[in-house]
Amino acid sequence: MWTLLVSLAAGALVSVGLRTTGAIHSTGAAVLPGVLVAAVAMVLLFRRVAGRIGPVIEEAQRHLQGGRRELAMASLRGGLELGRWHPLLEGSLRAQIGALLYDQQDYDGAAVELRRAAKRPWESRAFLACCYFRQRDDDGMAKAFEQAVKVGEKEDLAWTMYAWCLNAQGKKDAALQVLARGLEKNPGNQRLRGSVEALKEGKKIKVAPYGDRWARFGLDGSIATGGMKIPKAMRGFAQRPGFRQRPTKKR
């Protein structure tokens, strides 16, 4: 991560310079200015990277809205070169690339990207789990879903997807256990409760209430009405993290 290294180097140079030139006679006292310089340098570098990656994400979104999938993918891959400058950037971009490959039913390629992707938001791990589900990798699916529900424990859809896949594998009891865990984290959740009752009665898990959020994963062959797009929670870096955007001046 070049941002951290450059920032620390700048801070160290300031501290050493102040100490060796005699501007500050105490080594301990020379540390504080170096720390401040390192912090300022890191903030400025992060802002610079965020300012460069924001347009990349927005360009990818425009390509997707225009149905230009390959161009959207190229835009996101082009942003990977900035990953060395921000600790979270590469994982975020790979999550988005993986989601697009999943949409194209390239589950092998999607899994490769998603394994290197950030674990947050929970959708990143859920996409990976769905890849494993389609590849009939039961252990990989369970591991990825466990990560998904750990991150998104308050998201009833995460628990529902996990249970749906287990039930589809003929593991009804395991699916009920997952839904029960989901209810422990979300007491009184009517969607999870309804799915438990449906399974106990030998019916299908209820997924219709989730609409496009469920259809986005295409597990039951459903198609999102909004077409192909990166889930909002997975986009990231469309705006500078931690900083407000300057308002556009009206002419």
Where does each model-flagged region fall?
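Long, non-transmembrane cytosolic or organellar matrix-exposed soluble domains/tails
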Residues: 171-251
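Solenoid-like repeat scaffolds
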Residues: 43-47, 80-86, 114-121, 146-154, ...
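N-terminal topogenic membrane-targeting module
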Residues: 24-31, 35-108, 112-115
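Alpha-helical linker/edge segments of TPR/alpha-solenoid repeat scaffolds
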Residues: 51, 68-70, 98-109, 135-144, ...
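Alpha-helical adaptor scaffolds
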Residues: 83-164
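N-terminal alpha-helical segment
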Residues: 53-56, 72, 125, 141, ...
